[in-house]
Structure formats: structure tokens, C-alpha cells
Design a protein with these regions (language model features):
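Short glycine/serine/threonine-biased micro-segments
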Residues: 58, 62-66, 95, 132
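A short acidic Gly-Thr/Ser loop motif
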Residues: 43-44, 61-66, 221
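ATP-binding/phosphotransfer module of carbohydrate and carboxylate kinases, centering on a glycine-rich
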Residues: 25-28, 51-53, 59, 76, ...
Length: 221
């Protein structure tokens, strides 16, 4: 059954229910004759897919909108398993995006991570996922750019009232890649991105992603 939602999704009526049955019911209502034979975790599916190519695959990792990992474990090492099974091994979904739930003192949490967490639907949970996954990287970058702007180290001529500094999740994660890959002399891709936020007076230094310039720090620090 579905225990909880993550990554901003919120459908309370689905909590505690079997998502496969819910999906099948909706498919049937639409006259779509599909029978779901298995629901597979993405990291488990990644491991299984690669296992078709090599029988030595032992870990599957997903780094996408969220993050997770699955690995092959000896059944003898799984004390929670009370049912006897024929196989000596089992694939375990680690759900490592939840590392830091309730206690994140062992993680390198910054003030940016704390702000991200405080404005989510599940504060205090999925801490590692919020620190590194694609769903949040754009917002982490935006918050860091806002911090640099507040210290007049980036886009100092742009008002703090600009949507880039005020509107949550307006800076999509793929923009980080676009910025880092822009090697044109005048950083035209970066200029275009800034102009989409109404910033038309950026300096060359603002747009420069070489060395330790402000925009590079905003993306990578």
C-alpha cells in the first residue's frame, strides 16, 4: 500500500491504498484493457534491467527527480523476513532518499537545505533526496543565487524583488546544465536564461562560469 507521498505530490485519498488497484480501476473506467502484473520500484527495475546484460550487476542507482538505490542482499542477513523463500538472495530497495528522516545530524546540511525542507509537504523527511535530486537542484541553485545577490556578489543591479529571487521553484533544474555547458564567449545561453527572468543588464562576470566566478559558485558550491 502507499504509505506517503514525496517530491511535492499530494493525493491524500490514495494513502493506505494499493496503487495498482487504483490504477487498474481508472484504466477499466476508460475502457483500457490492461492488467498490471507487477509494480516495480525504479531502482529495483534499473538493477534488473542491467542484470539482463551482465550477471554481475549488484547495485541499481537512480539519480533523477528523486534518488534511490537497490542492491542484492543475502536472505540470511534480512531479520525482518519471516517467510522462507527458495532463493538465497533478495533485492532490497534502500529508499536512501529517506536518509536523515527525524535526525539529519550526520548529513552536511546547509541553511539552503533547511529552507528547502521547511517549505515541503513532508518537512523533516526525505532529507537526502531534498539535498541532491533533480526535483530540488534548481531551487537550491535559485536560493544560493538569491543569497549571493543579497551580499551583492551576483547580479547586483537586479532588484531583490525580481521573480528569480522571490518565486519558489521558478528556476528549473535543467537550466543548471544549460549554464554549465555554455562555453560561448559572451555566454549567450546564460544571457537568454537571465533575460527570461527579466534580467537584461547582467555583466560578463555575472554570466561567466569559468574559474570561481559567482554564477559557477551558485551552481556548484
Amino acid at each position: 500500500v502507499l504509505l506517503e507521498w514525496t517530491k511535492g505530490m499530494n493525493v491524500p485519498d490514495a494513502i493506505g491504498k494499493d496503487p495498482v488497484k487504483l490504477l487498474e480501476e481508472q484504466l477499466q473506467k476508460r475502457g483500457i484493457n490492461v492488467q498490471i502484473v507487477a509494480m516495480c520500484n525504479d531502482s529495483v527495475a534499473t538493477l534488473m534491467a542491467h542484470s539482463y546484460n551482465t550477471n554481475t550487476a549488484c547495485v541499481g542507482v537512480v539519480l533523477g527527480s528523486g534518488t534511490n538505490a537497490a542492491y542484492v542482499e543475502l536472505v540470511s542477513n534480512i531479520p525482518k523476513l519471516h517467510t522462507e523463500i527458495a532463493s538465497p538472495t533478495m533485492v532490497i530497495s534502500m529508499e536512501w532518499g529517506a536518509l536523515g528522516n527525524h535526525d539529519h545530524s550526520f548529513l552536511p546540511v546547509s541553511f539552503l537545505d533547511e529552507e528547502i525542507d521547511s517549505h515541503t509537504l513532508n518537512p523533516g523527511r526525505q532529507y537526502l533526496e531534498k539535498m541532491m535530486s533533480g526535483c530540488y537542484l534548481g531551487e537550491i541553485t535559485r536560493l544560493w543565487m538569491r543569497h549571493l545577490r543579497q551580499e551583492n556578489k551576483l547580479l547586483s543591479r537586479t532588484p531583490l524583488q525580481n521573480c528569480l529571487f522571490c518565486e519558489r521553484y521558478c528556476f528549473d533544474s535543467p537550466l543548471c546544465t544549460t549554464i554549465l555547458l555554455d562555453d560561448s564567449e559572451e555566454r549567450e545561453e546564460i544571457r537568454s536564461i537571465l533575460e527570461s527572468f527579466g534580467i537584461s543588464d547582467s555583466t560578463t562576470e555575472d554570466r561567466n562560469t569559468r574559474s570561481s566566478t559567482p554564477l559557477l559558485r551558485a551552481l556548484l558550491d
